[in-house]
Amino acid sequence: MSTAFRKIKLIFKKSDSQYPQNYRAEIKSRNKNTVITRHDLLIAHEMKQRASLERSNSIRNLQSQGKRRSDSKESRKL
């Protein structure tokens, strides 16, 4: 999905000046006859950002859990 989204985004940016600056601006994907609006692109971008944020948060949580486990093991040894 991400590569297709990037390609669509690039196509959209190149031809963006042809369309009015509102959410109803449309482009057609080169591969299919689907119409993609700027609003669709914004939603996809937001979903992508949320997914990366969730990934980084889950990584941080796992790392903090690992630190807590190692701290508790060290306290048991003492």
UniProtKB/Swiss-Prot annotation:
Annotated segments matching region Disordered: 49-78
Biased composition (Basic and acidic residues): 68-78
Positions with biased composition (Polar residues): 54-65
Source organism superkingdom: Eukaryota
Name this protein carries in UniProt: Uncharacterized protein YPR145C-A
Species the sequence originates in: Saccharomyces cerevisiae (strain ATCC 204508 / S288c) (Baker's yeast)
